[in-house]
């Protein structure tokens, strides 16, 4: 049976991950730890014999720079890459820039958990006059008004991620190309929910650690056979738990 593989990587720790702030579409860069995580991910992939034919990433530098570091470790800096806003992080609306723990102290752990991990719940929306609204950013100049979010739930994130998966990424993989996707916690949660057919309660508890390669294997009918992280299982579990704890009051 022919097995097709796909590699997903959440960007390495960003400067705002380090500061425990809601990031969303704000274009913050990797921290030093994040760059190290990305390089370690590339080394893991190299050690496991992975090479790629094509890469996808978002238009946010923390994902782009994660991909660059991975490809540098693989000696594949030349790899053809498509950047798309459809793989951006979920837009966190008016929460963008706020400290997660301080927000939890103000609104409660459960409310912040729902804002962070709930399926159909949107954080408070931005006003379009707010400088954080993506309509003011030239990289989104070609997006329609309907495509420019003032806030997003995971359900809304799925509405842009999954059509892009089905229309663009999946056909490339089905043609035999080896693909890596470097993206974000929630755009990858959207894809994982779809691939694994997870329920709303299941996706609420799913936390994807930064900078750890997640490998999916598919059968000839493009059904997932299994998925697994590369690396030390205990370290990966600890990183996922740390992600879950970011939204709790101190």
Curated annotation (Swiss-Prot):
Annotated catalytic residues: 11 (tele-phosphohistidine intermediate), 89 (proton donor/acceptor)
SMART domains given in the database record: PGAM
Pathway: Carbohydrate degradation; glycolysis; pyruvate from D-glyceraldehyde 3-phosphate: step 3/5
CDD domains registered for this protein in UniProt: HP_PGM_like
Source species, domain of life: Bacteria
EC identifiers of the protein: 5.4.2.11
Catalytic activity line of the entry: (2R)-2-phosphoglycerate = (2R)-3-phosphoglycerate
Any GO BP: gluconeogenesis
Site residues (Transition state stabilizer), renumbered to this chain: 184
Entry similarity comment: Belongs to the phosphoglycerate mutase family. BPG-dependent PGAM subfamily.
Function: Catalyzes the interconversion of 2-phosphoglycerate and 3-phosphoglycerate.
PANTHER family: PHOSPHOGLYCERATE MUTASE (PTHR11931)
The protein's name in its UniProt record: 2,3-bisphosphoglycerate-dependent phosphoglycerate mutase
Gene: gpmA
């Amino acid at each position: 049976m022919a097995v097709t593989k796909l590699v997903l990587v959440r960007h390495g720790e960003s400067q705002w991950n380090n500061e425990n702030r809601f990031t969303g579409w704000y274009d913050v860069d990797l921290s030093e730890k994040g760059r190290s995580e990305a390089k370690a991910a590339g080394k893991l992939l190299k050690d496991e014999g992975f090479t790629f034919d094509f890469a996808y990433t978002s238009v946010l530098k923390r994902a782009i720079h994660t991909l660059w570091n991975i490809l540098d470790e693989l000696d594949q800096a030349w790899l053809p890459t498509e950047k798309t806003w459809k793989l951006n992080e979920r837009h966190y609306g008016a929460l963008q820039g706020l400290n997660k723990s301080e927000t939890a102290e103000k609104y409660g752990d459960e409310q912040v958990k729902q804002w962070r991990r709930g399926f159909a719940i949107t954080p408070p929306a931005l006003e379009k006059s707010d400088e954080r609204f993506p309509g003011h950013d030239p990289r989104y100049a070609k997006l329609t008004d309907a495509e420019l979010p003032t806030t997003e739930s995971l359900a809304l994130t799925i509405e842009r991620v999954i059509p892009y998966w089905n229309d663009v990424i999946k056909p490339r993989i089905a043609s035999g190309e080896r693909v890596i996707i470097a993206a974000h916690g929630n755009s990858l949660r959207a894809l994982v929910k779809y691939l694994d057919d997870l329920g709303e309660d299941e996706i609420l508890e799913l936390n994807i650690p930064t900078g750890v390669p997640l490998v999916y294997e598919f059968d000839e009918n493009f059904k997932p056979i299994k998925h697994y992280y590369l690396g030390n299982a205990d370290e990966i579990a600890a990183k996922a738990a740390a992600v879950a704890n970011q939204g709790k009051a101190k």
